[in-house]
């Protein structure tokens, strides 16, 4: 019988702010904001060379978050500079995803800093998993992911879907911003949970304090969360000031979605696109099986040129040669024994 496979920074350099009058001092926050003005002026005067078509130039044009806990920001800047190999490696890893993420952030008129959040969450590792079960670029917990429409099955994990998870994360962040009215508090809630932040706000208000990020009693991870993001923002904003060089990433799509009408082997899809299987999986990490099964909320993503190649080859291909598995879609709950009986496995 034929066997049937069944798919059941120490900062040096320029100074652009006036010296204080005799006896005048600056607060740490004023110093932090002065550093941001330094970055902006350096950009305006061409100190940072970046083409207009660079994704970094577009990000810099929409950085807008004020600094919080400047002493922590400075500390994380120094750490990233001293670990420059890690910083460069992580930024390079963002290459396939940065345009898409930054473009989606810009469409929603969100601060450009949000596009750098996966640096903190996952280091742009699409299948990163935390010890508590969060997973993906945006580190969704299973329940939160499902709440924001990310399907999770034995065959597919939407938390690893680049497009779907980015959309879900931005929806979640916009909800949190609407709830708290402040991006630093929204980010704190993304990390710590909205209930925890709400309770911390009430405790601060009961103590007569303004409900700001700096005034909330938070765990160390959340206390450092936004300062760490702002440190990454500052390094991206003015890499030369920190002795760094960012990889050139064009402000244009790296990938696009293609439509398929029937299941096909992942290796066949890669072959039709003239790319390696590893290149295919880098953009489609949500799939846990060797078959791509089209569904309304799932997309196949391919590098732009490869997408054109795929579509041309897909139109000319024989569908029978693209799938080496039998795909069984049950219409109701079924036991493994019954499934084996029905499929002859």
Residue ranges and their predicted role:
Residues 81-96, 108, 131, 135, ...:
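Soluble non-cytosolic domains of exported or imported proteins
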Residues 3-7, 19-109, 114:
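An acidic, Gly/Ser/Thr/Pro-rich helix-cap/linker signature
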Residues 6-14:
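Sec-dependent N-terminal signal peptides
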Residues 75-88, 124-131, 139-181, 201-216:
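Substrate-binding clefts and substrate-entry loops adjacent to catalytic sites
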């Amino acid at each position: 019988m034929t066997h049937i496979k069944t798919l059941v920074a120490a900062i040096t350099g320029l100074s652009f702010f006036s010296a204080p009058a005799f006896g005048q001092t600056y607060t740490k926050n004023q110093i932090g904001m002065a550093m941001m003005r330094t970055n902006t002026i350096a950009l305006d005067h061409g100190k940072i060379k970046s083409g207009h078509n660079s994704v970094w130039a577009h990000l810099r044009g929409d950085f807008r978050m004020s600094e919080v806990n400047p002493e922590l920001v400075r500390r994380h800047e120094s750490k990233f500079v001293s670990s420059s190999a890690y910083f460069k490696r992580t930024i390079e890893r963002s290459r396939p995803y940065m345009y898409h993420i930054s473009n989606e952030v810009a469409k929603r008129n969100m601060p450009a800093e949000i596009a750098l959040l996966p640096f903190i969450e996952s280091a742009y590792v699409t299948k990163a998993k935390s010890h508590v079960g969060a997973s993906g670029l945006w580190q969704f917990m299973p329940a939160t992911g499902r709440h924001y429409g990310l399907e999770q099955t034995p065959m597919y994990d939407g938390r690893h879907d680049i497009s779907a998870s980015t959309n879900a994360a931005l929806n979640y962040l916009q909800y949190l911003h609407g709830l708290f009215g402040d991006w630093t508090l929204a980010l704190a809630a993304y990390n710590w949970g909205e209930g925890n932040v709400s309770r911390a706000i009430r405790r601060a208000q009961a103590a007569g304090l303004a409900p700001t990020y700096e005034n909330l009693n938070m765990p160390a991870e959340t206390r450092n969360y936004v300062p760490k993001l702002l440190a990454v923002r500052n390094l991206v904003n003015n890499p030369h000031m920190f002795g760094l060089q960012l990889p050139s990433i064009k402000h244009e799509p790296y990938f696009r979605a293609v439509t398929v009408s029937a299941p096909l082997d992942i290796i066949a899809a890669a072959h039709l696109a003239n790319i390696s299987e590893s290149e295919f999986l880098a953009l489609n990490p949500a799939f846990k099986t060797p078959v791509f099964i089209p569904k309304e909320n799932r997309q196949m993503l391919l590098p732009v040129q490869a997408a054109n190649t795929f579509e041309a080859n897909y139109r000319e291909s024989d569908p029978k040669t693209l799938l080496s598995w039998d795909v069984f879609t049950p219409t109701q709950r079924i036991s493994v024994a019954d499934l084996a009986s029905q499929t002859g496995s």
